[in-house]
Amino acid sequence: MNLYFLFFISTILAAKPFNSFNKTSLIDEGVDNDDDIVSKRAVVIDYCDTRHPNNLCKKYFEIDSYWNDDTDCFTNIGCKVYGGFDIIGGKAPKIGTVCRLKKGKNKFGYCNSKGNCVERDFIESFGVSIKIKGISHRGDDEPACPLYENTWINYGKCNEPYHCGTNYGLFYANKRKLNYFPDNGQKCNSKYEIYGVCYLGRCHGTGNFSNGEVFSEFGTIFKDVEIVTLSDGKNSSKRGKHKNLHGSKVFDSNGIYDIDPKNWKIEDDDKDITVHENAGDPKSDSRRC
């Protein structure tokens, strides 16, 4: 009984109080041995991943999204209680998460529903749009590229009309040649628009080439990119249903799959509408950049 009491007290002392937790994104810097490029990898610790099958992962637990093996789609996004006790049980593939196709190679794909890391197929659409406007802080783990500035795009169609990509494979947009990746700093489109990509829960971008910026492995972290879901949740190619906050707007993915994205965009009177998910709803994902 005394031993149990001592263990209980030590556990309480080891735990950090929630209100003292610093909600920041940690950056781990390392050197890429292939081409001596300094890489940065974000570790999300500011929210819990409600997509995880462990429903005990609530606000009092912190997220550690750092993969030991980013080729393994069955690696958990760890949900840990303050004090470091790992309460995760079982493993599940993070469908749609960016993953490394082969160890030691800077070429990336996505995790499919079978847990395999595969190259992106442009027949599929994962139902996420991106808008370069507004402020939000949580992200999805999938690549995206904008078609027109300040408009919603379906990145399953982002190969039209641009061929956008990076030499690290975080942007796939050349349907005819999937292994096409520009060199560092190579222009991705004629308008020099900023591209955004969410990776490991934070939103990254390639930079604005008109200002002389260049590609980096995961890009520059952006906080002004919003994600909206376009999915019906019926299969791995479409993200799950989400309840949106009052006043927000969401699109039905089934209604846009066969529409050329250059033919649809936000109407003028809707440009300032903030579209996001209800992170407070346990049935809703909290994927926002």
From Swiss-Prot:
Posterior glands which appear to be connected with the stylet through a series of ducts. Residues 1-14 form the signal peptide. The keyword Signal applies. GO terms for cellular component: extracellular region. Residues 15-27 form a propeptide. Keywords: Disulfide bond, Neurotoxin, Secreted, Signal, Toxin. Residues 270-289 are annotated as: Disordered. The keyword Signal applies. It comes from the Eukaryota. This is Toxin tox21A. Has contracting-paralyzing activity in insect larvae. It is found in: Secreted.
